[in-house]
Regions:
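Active-site hotspot residues in diverse enzymes, especially metal/ion-binding acidic/histidine motifs
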Residues: 1-116
């Protein structure tokens, strides 16, 4: 997926829902956001997206500062929007910087574009 495609996906979502806050956007889209204590170790899971039986869920590590939770939520929202058919994504700090993972790179670009 090209950068232009990702920008267009963000623009389309914001226009459709009239929302630029990822927490409210998830609510508008019917995506359930859950909070779970997943630890503070450097390799702790930061968040993940899961779609099961048409129920979309993003789980965020509640041990993280709110500003980081917002970034993680935008990243996972990117997976929900861009990678619907893939099912489950676990977001580790290492994965965020893994440029060999195209889906992680796309979700990072989505989050960056969404939050600016």
């Amino acid at each position: 997926m090209s950068y232009a495609d990702i920008c267009e996906a963000v623009k389309r979502l914001k226009k459709k829902y009239g929302e630029s806050d990822p927490f409210r956007l998830c609510r508008e889209m019917g995506i359930v956001v859950l909070y779970q204590s997943l630890g503070t170790a450097p390799d702790a899971i930061k968040g993940f997206y899961l779609e099961c039986k048409r129920v979309k869920t993003i789980t965020i590590n509640s041990d993280l500062p709110l500003v980081i939770q917002k970034i993680i939520l935008a990243h996972e929202l990117g997976h929900a929007e861009l990678h619907r058919s893939e099912g489950l994504y676990a977001f580790h700090e290492v994965a965020m910087f893994d440029e060999s993972s195209i889906m992680e790179k796309e979700a990072n670009l989505f989050a960056a574009e969404f939050l600016i």
